[in-house]
Amino acid sequence: MTSHPRDTPQFYLTAPSPCPYLPGQEERKVFTHLVGRRARDLNEILTQGGFRRSQTIAYRPACETCRACVSVRVVVEDFAITGSQRRILQRNAELIGTPEPNRPASEQYALFRRYLDARHGDGGMVDMTVLDYAMMIEDSHVDTHLVVYRERGPDSAIHGRGVGAPVAVCLTDVLADGLSMVYSFYDPDEASRSLGTYMILDHIRRARALGLPYLYLGYWVDGSRKMDYKAKFKPQERLMPQGWVRVE
């Protein structure tokens, strides 16, 4: 039997399953485990090559007849905010996002459950238990943290933190060339605040403050209404067969 060192990545292919984005299509994924001493370096390389992280798994689409999933990353330094995006920032001026260790909490899970039930009731994550949520948040061998958004309080100017229950949460990886928004969720009763867009705008600001050139948004799927929002942050780069291509 051939043995493989723990630090040598092995890649696997999933069986076909229904595509969650395009009706009538099937999806397959290639994946590997992010474990061992080289997990962080491997995650950096794979993210730049179009992979996404979920817990200790890095994956990317490997569909036989479709190439609709396209990795996108915002060019932070050149990002041109639109009028509607500026209004979203103003609408959420009383929110404070605080970086916190990637530790799960009951108030996070309560918000996560409400978000799934309201926004993704027919999705693959809808049956996630509190244990599943805890694993999603803390099961990581790479540099990751939570950004937890709460309302501004009377003493927020002193301690720099919001108060009350979370309004929105983002699990964020820190890479050598950018931030990667792994998963985000928010209060579904606050839909008028466009909190998903707000978190992206806030992460663009965070990446710029850290001197990082990119914000990785995951996959954009042309023709999928679920993914349309990712095309609104420009300039951005999209990973094509010839490499990353800038889109203005």
Curated annotation (Swiss-Prot):
It is found in: Cytoplasm. It is an enzyme of class 2 (transferase). One of its GO terms (biological process) is ubiquitin-dependent protein catabolic process via the N-end rule pathway. The keyword Transferase applies. It catalyses: N-terminal L-glutamyl-[protein] + L-leucyl-tRNA(Leu) = N-terminal L-leucyl-L-glutamyl-[protein] + tRNA(Leu) + H(+); N-terminal L-aspartyl-[protein] + L-leucyl-tRNA(Leu) = N-terminal L-leucyl-L-aspartyl-[protein] + tRNA(Leu) + H(+). Signal peptide: none annotated. This is Aspartate/glutamate leucyltransferase. It comes from Methylorubrum extorquens (strain CM4 / NCIMB 13688) (Methylobacterium extorquens). The lineage of its organism: Bacteria, Pseudomonadati, Pseudomonadota, Alphaproteobacteria, Hyphomicrobiales.
